[in-house]
Design a protein with these regions (language model features):
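Intrinsic disorder/low-complexity segments
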Residues: 10-14, 18
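Eukaryote-biased recognition of intrinsically disordered, low-complexity regulatory segments
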Residues: 26-46
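Short strand-turn-strand beta-turns centered on an Asx-Gly dipeptide
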Residues: 33, 50, 95-97
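Ferredoxin-type iron-sulfur electron-transfer modules in oxidoreductases and energy-metabolism complexes
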Residues: 56-75, 122-274
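Glycine-rich phosphate/adenylate-binding loop and adjacent beta-alpha elements
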Residues: 95-119, 124
Length: 274
């Protein structure tokens, strides 16, 4: 079945521009990783889904499949999700070998089925990293990220009461860089894409968005030392600067944050040794 969706765009001249977006239904074959728990060996199982709308999100397609499995008396596929609008970072999975699927700067919940075509075979599996053990099926334990944040990814000094806007002057470039780094949603795509399972982009983003602002300055040195120490303790790998993390980050976090992190860590280490 083929239909058309109307998209209206306004311009400064108040004229309407209309785009016709074709939408259609498709039949797909899914190869999904099923694993009962961390100790289970796990493996792929194949499912056929029919009449999937091109305008469904990837997770909505999973909802349809799970409803069918439940009606058949089978156990539904376990997958993580919450906001379904690209904010929480919960819907983390490989889709055809790519974190979050084929679209760039996009989370799984924002991926629509028009990214695929009728008859496609789609392979879905959980993050593969020592620090992200599988809980069940496509759900992994990402609490290692939480422990890194608990080690120093916050501001604990008393910053006083809320003040008027612009009371603390901040250079525009620093404000822009901090804002861009703060876009990190902690989904773990950077770790999943890295051949070494490094978490430096995640840590770098957190260190940058706090350390660049005046409120985060007092704890700047202890923050980076403690967060790196916890990252190493969790078993994440080293960074070899391949750039795979930036390429797959759904929020486009730049690897310049890793360079900034290395600088911060070196300076903090020198001071701590004195």
């Amino acid at each position: 079945m083929v239909g058309y969706e109307l998209n209206f765009h306004t311009s400064t001249s108040s004229h309407y521009h209309i785009d016709y977006m074709e939408h259609y239904n498709m039949n797909l074959t899914l190869k999904v990783w099923r694993q009962k728990n961390q100790n289970d060996r796990g493996g792929f199982e194949t499912y056929n889904v029919k009449n999937i709308s091109s305008e469904m999100s990837f997770l909505e397609m999973f909802d349809v499949l799970n409803e069918e499995l439940i009606h058949e008396g089978k156990e539904p596929i376990a997958f993580d999700h919450d906001c379904r609008e690209g904010i929480c970072g919960m819907c983390s999975m490989y889709i055809d070998g790519k974190p979050h699927g084929p679209w760039e700067q996009n989370t799984t919940c924002q991926l629509h089925m028009r990214a695929f075509k009728d008859g496609d075979t789609i392979t879905v599996e959980p993050w593969r990293a020592k620090a992200f053990p599988v809980i069940k099926d496509l759900i992994v334990d990402r609490t290692s990220f939480d422990r890194i944040i608990q080690a120093g990814g916050y501001i604990s000094v008393n910053t006083g009461n809320a003040v008027d806007a612009n009371a603390l002057p901040i250079e525009k470039q620093k404000a822009d860089d901090a804002f861009a780094a703060a876009a990190c949603i902690g989904c773990g795509a950077c770790v999943a894409a890295c051949k070494n399972s490094s978490a430096l982009l995640f840590v770098g983003a957190k260190v940058a968005h706090l350390g660049l602002l005046p409120q985060g300055e007092p704890e700047r040195k202890t923050r980076v030392l403690n967060m790196i120490a916890q990252m190493d303790k969790e078993g994440f790998g080293s960074c070899t600067a391949t750039g795979a993390c930036e390429a797959t980050c759904p929020k486009g976090i730049s690897i310049t944050n890793i360079a900034r992190l290395n600088k911060e860590y070196t300076l903090a280490s020198l001071v701590s040794e004195k």
